[in-house]
Amino acid sequence: MSSEFESNTTENPIDNTAVISADSDTTQTNTADSNNADKKEEPLIHCDNLVKIYKTSDIEVMALQGLDFDVHKGELIAIIGKSGSGKSTLLNILGGLEKPTAGYIMFDGDMISEISQKELCEIRSNKIGYVWQKNTDNLLQYLTAVQNVEMPLLFSNLSKKEREQMAKEALDKVGLSEKYNSFPTSMSGGEQQRVAIAAAIVKKPELLLMDEPTGAVDKRTSDNLQQLFRKLNKETGITIIIVTHDISLADNVDRVVMISDGKISSERILKERYNSIKNENGSLADGIGGNTENSEDESTHEEFMILDKAGRVRLSPEMQEAAGINSNRVRIEVEDGKIVIRSEDE
C-alpha cells in the first residue's frame, strides 16, 4: 500500500467529524466480520441508526444522530456524556418510554420501535426495571420498604403472602434485611436508592436501567451502590445500563460508552472482558476502532474510538489540540499499516 493514503475526508456540518474511506481495509474488515458472524452471540439489545428529533412550533433539536449500539446479556455498562449529549434520550428509547424518529431497536428479539403499545407495556412490565435519580420518582413516602417493593407485583396473580415474600427477598439482595417495615422518610438517601433497586428487580427483569443512581448521594454511598451494582450483575446475571455523570463508575463496569452530539464517540472496555471477547470472536464488536491512551484507566480498561458505518470517527477537542489541529483540514496517510492524521501545516 502506498504511503500516500487516498481518502475522502469531508466535514460533517452536524457533528464536525471526519469521514475516512479506505476501501481495501473496509473489504478486509467486512470479510472478518462475516467470518465471525456465526460465532457472535445475538445481542440482547441492538440499536441501528437511531435518530431522535424533538420538535416545537419554532425549533427542532436532534438528540440522537444515527446512533448504533449493541448490548449483550449480562453486561454492566455505564453511559456517560455531557448534558444534552443524548444519553438520557437513549435510555428512554432503550426502555420503550420513547420511540425513535428513525432507525430501529431490537430487544430480546422484539422490534420494540415497531410493536403495539400493549406489547410494549408487557415488555416494560416484565422484562425491564427502572431506577430514577430522584427518590420521589421511585418510592411512595407513605408506604414501608416492603410495600414499595410489592407495588410492581400488585397486578400479578400472586397472593399477598407470595408478594410479600418476593419483596423481602429483593430487599435482602440489596442489603436491607433490617428495613422491611421502615418508611423512606426514616432512611438515608443510599438506603432509599436500595429500596428503589429492590423494586426494580423484584420481578426478575432481564434489563435494569438506571438514570443517575448515584447523583444525589455522597462519595461513600456512591461507592457502596457501585459495589451493589456489580454484585447484582454477577449474582443474578441481570444486564445493567447506567446513565451517569459519575466518572468513578468507570472502574466498576464492564464497558463505558461515551456519547457526544447524539452519537457514541468512544468506548472503554474492561481488559479482562475485552481479552475474553477477542479470544472468543477473533475480533471486537462492530464499530470499535483504534486504541487510545488513558493514564487514569490504563490498568483496568482498553479504550477505543468508534468508527461508524459511514467510516466517520470523532476526534475530541482535546485530541485535536494535542495534535495541533486547528482547522477543518487534516493530512491523512497510511504508514506501516496505520492511519496517521496530521494537521495541515505539517
Each predicted region: which residue ranges?
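ABC ATPase NBD coupling module
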Residues: I59, I112-G129
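Helix-to-loop junction immediately C-terminal to a conserved catalytic motif
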Residues: G95
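Conserved ABC transporter NBD signature motif
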Residues: G103-M111
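Short coil-to-helix segment of the ABC ATPase nucleotide-binding domain corresponding to the Q-loop/switch region
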Residues: Y142-E150
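Conserved ABC ATPase signature
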Residues: F183-M187, E191
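A short, proline-enriched helix->beta-strand linker immediately N-terminal to the Walker B motif
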Residues: V202-E206
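Catalytic Walker B motif of ABC-type/P-loop ATPase nucleotide-binding domains
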Residues: L208-D211
